[in-house]
């Protein structure tokens, strides 16, 4: 299957790759409506109003609860709940990553491809923390305007860096006040699969080049990437599309992802001297008191969540 992506393609939050950020925010809103389950793991009070502001009917109805179980066939209703739970687990992992990083004294953070991420507004950042959000200009501008209309105030010194990650984003980051001599906490949430293999390696190299010793990085992806895993992910995404197509959502999500041979991020970073730890989504479900999603219940199969620390030798 070829990708629908091309060199220089751009998007907003209602099209192409940008729509995946709206999809994830809608899933966070679904989780929030389950306070005894997924909503107890992670809650994003800004998810629903942000999705509503984007204006994609299917995701608006999903986020607001208008697309409820009575309207859905059983398979789609269950799949939607599972998707919300999976995104709650993912959200909590990256929330905890930042909280742990700042507890260690880190006061500089970067969110790459920030989309509709609201951590700048909802996490309890320590005084003196600077948080950089990097994404395409249309995405950055929309989120700033929408959250301003909602009366939301950042809980950190939030700095928007409106630049495509295929451009010289490190220069734009430094221009916004980023200090590469300070320890940094980086996240690339839901990003790497939308990059070709060589672009993924380049991104990791760029992060490493700007990371002082003791900096931290977190991301997620498929374990042991190979043709079988890629085909499994493609099949799962196609099944998700078929469910949602019945309710007016018409976008081939699999066509946005690059299914090419690549070194997984954990292996790549470990080879460069980073200390890498990992946890599977099944382990995280159990840790947070949720029933793990097995087999076809898991929207994207088994996902591995990675956290890495750059040691002194890697920084030398």
Curated annotation (Swiss-Prot):
Ranges in coiled-coil conformation: none
Keyword Metal-binding in record: no
Alphabetic keyword roster: Methyltransferase, S-adenosyl-L-methionine, Transferase
Gene Ontology MF term list: methyltransferase activity
Biological process terms in GO annotation: methylation
Binding site for S-adenosyl-L-methionine: 135, 164-165
EC class (word): transferase
Family as reported in the entry's similarity comment: Belongs to the UPF0677 family.
Name of the featured protein: Putative S-adenosyl-L-methionine-dependent methyltransferase MMAR_1069
Source species of the chain: Mycobacterium marinum (strain ATCC BAA-535 / M)
Lineage: Bacteria, Bacillati, Actinomycetota, Actinomycetes, Mycobacteriales
